[in-house]
Curated annotation (Swiss-Prot):
InterPro entries noted in UniProt: Dimethylallyltransferase (IPR039657), IPT (IPR018022), P-loop_NTPase (IPR027417)
SUPFAM superfamilies: P-loop containing nucleoside triphosphate hydrolases
Function: Catalyzes the transfer of a dimethylallyl group onto the adenine at position 37 in tRNAs that read codons beginning with uridine, leading to the formation of N6-(dimethylallyl)adenosine (i(6)A).
Reactions mediated catalytically: adenosine(37) in tRNA + dimethylallyl diphosphate = N(6)-dimethylallyladenosine(37) in tRNA + diphosphate
Protein name: tRNA dimethylallyltransferase
Similarity section: Belongs to the IPP transferase family.
Cofactor(s) needed for function: Mg(2+)
Enzyme class: transferase
Residues covered by region (Interaction with substrate tRNA): 42-45
Subunit structure comment from the entry: Monomer.
Chain positions of site Interaction with substrate tRNA: T101
C-alpha cells in the first residue's frame, strides 16, 4: 500500500459530487495546514476545448481538468499514472478524488492489472467483428487482446486498495437525480454551443478529433444541431436521455465498488450533499482518515 491517504467522492453525474469533493478538500486543507488537492477522475473532463459540455467549472482548482486537447487519445493507464502522481505528490500526503468514471476510479485506487494499449487498426477490426455480440464492447475488448496476442487481464475488482482509502458515494433517489439531470442538460444545451462551435472549427480545418469526444454526451447532439440536423430542444432532450442512461450505469458500477470495498475501506453512502449524516462525515473526515 502506498503512503498516502485518499478520500474518493463518487456518484452519478449531477449528484453534486464535485461540490462535495471541493468542500472536503477545502476542509482537509484547513485541518492539515497544507493544500490538499482535488483530483478529478473523469474520462471527459481532461479535454480542454469542451469545458461547458463537461461541466469543468468548480469552486477551487483541481488536477486533471482540461489538460489535453481533443485531438489527443486519453487512456485509463495515462489517467492512473497522472492521478497517482498528483496523489503521491501532495505535500499533505492526502488527496480527494472527484470520480465519475468507474473504470478510472478502480484503476486509481485499486492495484489491478490494466490491459495493454492496442493499435487503432486492431481496435477497429475487433469492433466490427463484435458488432453483433450480446455485449459488443466487452466482446470487442476480448478480440482486441486476442488479435494483439496479449493475455486477458485479471479482474478489475479483486485488487487491494492502493492507498489508505475512504469512499463517499452519493447515491440520489431516481426522481431527484432525473430532475438534476434535466437542469444540467438544459444548461449544457445553452452554454455548450461555444464548445461545439470550437470543435466544428477544428473539424473543418481538418483536425482529427478523438472519436470518443465526438461521440460523447453533449458533443454529438450539439454538433448535430449546428449541422442543422436537429433543433436545440431536440438536442437538449437527447442529452437528457443519454445522461439518465449514463447515470444508471454509473450507479451500478459504484454499487459494486462499494460492495467490493466493504471491510477494506471506510464507506459513507448518502442520498444527497445536504444529508445530515454526510455533513457530519465531511467535518470529521480528517479524524477518520488519520493525521
Amino acid at each position: 500500500m502506498r503512503s498516502a491517504r485518499v478520500v474518493a467522492v463518487c456518484g452519478p453525474t449531477a449528484s453534486g459530487k464535485s461540490e462535495v469533493a471541493d468542500e472536503l478538500s477545502a476542509l482537509l486543507t484547513e485541518a492539515e495546514g497544507v493544500w490538499v488537492p482535488t483530483v478529478v477522475v473523469d474520462s471527459m473532463q481532461v479535454y480542454r476545448e469542451i469545458p461547458e459540455i463537461t461541466n469543468q467549472a468548480r469552486s477551487r482548482p483541481a488536477e486533471l481538468v482540461g489538460v489535453v486537447p481533443v485531438t489527443r487519445e486519453w487512456t485509463v493507464a495515462e489517467h492512473r499514472r497522472r492521478a497517482r502522481a498528483a496523489i503521491e505528490g501532495s505535500g499533505a500526503g492526502a488527496a480527494v478524488l472527484d470520480a465519475g468514471t468507474g473504470m478510472y476510479l478502480n484503476a486509481t485506487v485499486l492495484d489491478i492489472p490494466l490491459a495493454p494499449k492496442v493499435p487503432r487498426e486492431i481496435r477497429a477490426l475487433a469492433q466490427r467483428a463484435a458488432a453483433g455480440a450480446a455485449n459488443p464492447r466487452r466482446e470487442a475488448r476480448r478480440l482486441e487482446l486476442e488479435l494483439y496476442g496479449a493475455p486477458e487481464r485479471g479482474s478489475i475488482w479483486e485488487g487491494e486498495p492502493a492507498y489508505e482509502l475512504a469512499l463517499i458515494y452519493l447515491r440520489p433517489e431516481r426522481a431527484s437525480l432525473d430532475e438534476a439531470i434535466a437542469r444540467r442538460s438544459s444548461r449544457i444545451a445553452r452554454r455548450g454551443l461555444a464548445d461545439a462551435r470550437r470543435l466544428q472549427d477544428l473539424l473543418e480545418a481538418g483536425a482529427r478529433v478523438n472519436p470518443s469526444v465526438l461521440g460523447s454526451i453533449g458533443v454529438r447532439e450539439l454538433l448535430s444541431h449546428l449541422r442543422g440536423e436537429i433543433s436545440l430542444p431536440e438536442a437538449e432532450e437527447t442529452i437528457s436521455v443519454r445522461t439518465r442512461h449514463l447515470a444508471r450505469r454509473q450507479m451500478r458500477w459504484f454499487d459494486k465498488l462499494a460492495r467490493t470495498l466493504s471491510g477494506r475501506a471506510r464507506l459513507v453512502v448518502s442520498p444527497s450533499p445536504e444529508d445530515p449524516a454526510l455533513r457530519k462525515a465531511l467535518h470529521s473526515m480528517h479524524d477518520i482518515i488519520g493525521a
